[in-house]
Regions:
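Adenosine-cofactor binding site in Rossmann-like domains, unifying the SAM/SAH pocket
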Residues: 27, 31-50
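Active-site "gating" loop of Rossmann-like NAD(P)-dependent oxidoreductase/epimerase domains
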Residues: 66-69, 74, 106-127
Length: 175
């Protein structure tokens, strides 16, 4: 019998967290814990430590994020709290409890000036508050040898505003 792997997914109400919940039942050897902010506020170090003390978690996929790119320019404090400070808290908890963190990030850590697709080894140059906040969170994860996955324009049919729905909306609004 294979060992059951436990994966904590933060940001369970967001687009990526919701989609991971949709497919979780396909994996019999994985026990998923889907954490919304009400279950686990990753900006609260006490809550994080208590949560991790009570169970063994093999992996944590952090999908929790402040993703309102334009609004982040006006609310940088919240963007940095969620995208960097909270990530730093999560990194500490994962490191203490031997949990491997997979931090979900963004292509906004780059300046967009490349004519070819970016590689993970390319220099970063975040221009926006959102990009800078995500880059700082990446730094916390990478310093402790955790993983970072950079995404761009996630899309899904069932979840809120995303690339697919934005393109459909723009296509119907423009001549």
């Amino acid at each position: 019998m294979n060992k059951l792997i436990t994966i904590l997914v933060t940001g369970a109400k967001g687009q990526l967290g919701s989609e991971l919940q949709e497919i979780a039942s396909r994996y019999e050897n994985i026990h998923f814990i889907f954490a919304t902010k009400s279950l686990l506020d990753i900006s609260n170090t006490t809550a994080l430590n208590d949560f991790f003390k009570n169970q063994t978690i093999d992996f944590c996929i952090n999908t929790a994020a402040y993703t309102a790119v334009d609004h982040a320019e006006k609310d940088s404090e919240t963007a940095f709290l969620i995208n960097s400070t909270a990530v730093g808290n999560l990194v500490k908890a994962c490191s203490i409890h031997n949990t491997k963190l997979i931090q979900i990030s963004t292509d906004f850590v780059f300046d967009g000036k490349n004519d070819v697709p970016y590689k993970e080894t390319d220099p970063t140059n975040a221009l926006s508050v959102y990009g800078k906040s995500k880059l700082k969170g990446e730094g916390f994860a990478l310093k402790q040898n955790h993983m970072v996955i950079r995404t761009s324009w996630l899309y899904s049919y069932s979840y809120g505003n995303n690339f697919l729905k934005t393109m459909i909306r723009l296509g119907t609004e423009r001549d």
